């Protein structure tokens, strides 16, 4: 492979490209493959970009030279076109070849012009070729990232330390060695309950893939009642829950700490199935409360309405009629869907939630490290009215969901 001398990164690129091209068409060697590191991939991409910039700069310089040649030819005037007749004289002194110029000089200029045009075309072809190659490399990186999502271990238990956890996850140095067969691996479980049915009994981070959804990581709690998917956790105020609609839709936070899984992911897990919602509450004296009730969760077209049955619907202030009972739409400060016509509950309080009329519950409110003295401030906190009252900010909460068939089976 012939590489023109360019910048240092381009030389690295040429070497890497030559290696890739030479590997094509040869049968696989028995020795284990050498994996390119993530830094080498970055260097390859950086080299591609530098080569592209270098080629473009060369094109610009060539264009400047071409412009100079064109100006020199323009100075020749009509003489560059030659006489109109076999013996036709020049019309006037302006048509004459400038002093010091000869037909041989004009011929040389034309030859140089053609050569420069040819070089420009070749450079444009090289730039286009490198851009296509860079696009293919970007596509390959994206495909490999998808494959690592499929190859990632479906389980990271809570008991392992960070060092051992790092060993469980594939590193970027392994990406280049992945084979096309990786796409035919077993599909991850639909939810934590399906993982429980497959024999998993340890709680921790797992990869799931609900129907019609790409795979993603969730925190699973394995109990005697089956597998529960954790969709929310508050415990120390490390994450700001006063987020926008898009943030609540997509999810935010740290699955190992405080987080909100995301309304769209919750909806993909529940689908059209009925689910059981578990609400774990804790006050500042160490007392705990567990609530469980059936729900349906609508899609974005219903503002992710939480559809409830009696008596929970009354407890949470649901009044909208839905196919599965009474419903509470989800609201944020920039998407007001609550049942108060004169007030935006998310703005008045804090966080996004199924507010109802603002006064029944809000587990995504402002986190307080101690109970504020002012009642006006306490109302913005995390509360569940039927337990500890409207103005008692809770210390910790966890929300979990499980398909109804699991509850019926147990």
UniProtKB/Swiss-Prot annotation:
Highest taxon listed in the record's lineage: Eukaryota
Induction of its expression: Induced in interstitial capillaries in response to hind leg ischemia. Alterations in nutrition and leptin administration are found to modulate the expression in vivo.
InterPro entries: FIB_ANG-like, Fibrinogen-like_C, Fibrinogen_a/b/g_C_1, Fibrinogen_a/b/g_C_dom, Fibrinogen_CS
Basic and acidic residues biased stretches: 84-98
Molecular function as annotated in GO: enzyme inhibitor activity; identical protein binding; lipase binding; lipase inhibitor activity
Residue intervals of the Fibrinogen C-terminal domain: 183-405
Protein keywords: Angiogenesis, Coiled coil, Disulfide bond, Extracellular matrix, Glycoprotein, Lipid metabolism, Secreted, Signal
Residue positions the entry lists as glycosylated: 181, 236, 242
Signal peptide (UniProt feature, chain positions): 1-23
Gene Ontology, cellular component aspect: extracellular region; extracellular space
An individual GO BP term: protein unfolding
UniProt note: phenotype after gene disruption: Pups are born at less than the expected Mendelian rate, indicative of significant embryonic lethality. No obvious phenotype after birth; mice are viable and fertile. Mutant mice have reduced circulating triglyceride and cholesterol levels when fed a high-fat diet. Besides, they display 30% lower non-fasted blood glucose levels and improved glucose tolerance when fed a high-fat diet. In contrast, glucose levels and glucose tolerance are not different from wild-type when mice are kept on a normal diet.
Lipid metabolism keyword on record: yes
Location(s), subcellular: Secreted; Secreted, Extracellular space, Extracellular matrix
Cystine residue pairs: 192-220, 345-358
Self-association and partners: Homooligomer; disulfide-linked via Cys residues in the N-terminal part of the protein. The homooligomer undergoes proteolytic processing to release the ANGPTL4 C-terminal chain, which circulates as a monomer. The homooligomer unprocessed form is able to interact with the extracellular matrix.
Other comments on record: Upon heterologous expression under the control of the keratinocyte promoter in the skin, inhibits tumor-associated angiogenesis and tumor growth. In xenograft models, it inhibits both intra- and extravasation of tumor cells as well as vascular permeability leading to inhibition of metastases. Expression by tumor cells induces reorganization of the actin cytoskeleton through inhibition of actin stress fiber formation and vinculin localization at focal contacts. It might prevent the metastatic process by inhibiting vascular activity as well as tumor cell motility and invasiveness.
Name this protein carries in UniProt: Angiopoietin-related protein 4
Species the sequence originates in: Mus musculus (Mouse)
């Amino acid at each position: 492979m012939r590489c023109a001398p360019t910048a240092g990164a381009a030389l690295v690129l040429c070497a890497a490209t030559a290696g890739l091209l030479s590997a094509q068409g040869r049968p696989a060697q028995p020795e284990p493959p050498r994996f390119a590191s993530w830094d080498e991939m970055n260097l390859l991409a950086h080299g591609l970009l530098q080569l592209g910039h270098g080629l473009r700069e060369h094109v610009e310089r060539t264009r400047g030279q071409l412009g100079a040649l064109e100006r020199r030819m323009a100075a020749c005037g009509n003489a560059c076109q030659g006489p109109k007749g076999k013996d036709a004289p020049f019309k006037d002194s302006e048509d004459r070849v400038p002093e010091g110029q000869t037909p041989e000089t004009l011929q040389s200029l034309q030859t140089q012009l053609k050569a420069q045009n040819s070089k420009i075309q070749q450079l444009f072809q090289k730039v286009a070729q490198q851009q296509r190659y860079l696009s293919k490399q970007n596509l390959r990186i994206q495909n490999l990232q998808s494959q690592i999502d499929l190859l990632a271990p479906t389980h990271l238990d809570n008991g392992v330390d960070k060092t051992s956890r790092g060993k469980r996850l594939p590193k970027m140095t392994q990406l280049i060695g992945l084979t096309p067969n990786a796409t035919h691996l077993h599909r991850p479980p639909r939810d934590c309950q399906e993982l429980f049915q497959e024999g998993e009994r340890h709680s921790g981070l797992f990869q799931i893939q609900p129907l019609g959804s790409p795979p993603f990581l969730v925190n699973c709690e394995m109990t005697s009642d089956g597998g529960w998917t954790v969709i929310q956790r508050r415990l120390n105020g490390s994450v700001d829950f006063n987020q926008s609609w898009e943030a609540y839709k997509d999810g935010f936070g740290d699955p190992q700490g405080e987080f909100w899984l995301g309304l769209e992911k919750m909806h993909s897990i529940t689908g059209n199935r009925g689910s059981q919602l578990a609400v774990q509450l804790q006050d500042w004296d160490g007392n705990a409360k567990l609530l469980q009730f059936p729900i349906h969760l609508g899609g974005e077209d219903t503002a992710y309405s939480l559809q409830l049955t009696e008596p929970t619907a009354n407890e949470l202030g649901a009044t909208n009629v839905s196919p599965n009972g009474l419903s509470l739409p989800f609201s944020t400060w920039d998407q007001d869907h609550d049942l108060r016509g004169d007030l935006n509950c998310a703005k008045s309080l804090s966080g996004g939630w199924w507010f109802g009329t603002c006064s029944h519950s809000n587990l995504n409110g402002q986190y307080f490290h101690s109970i504020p003295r002012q009642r006006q401030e306490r109302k913005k906190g995390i509360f569940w009215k039927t337990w500890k009252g409207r103005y008692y900010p809770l210390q910790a909460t966890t929300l979990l969901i499980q398909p109804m068939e699991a509850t019926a089976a147990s």
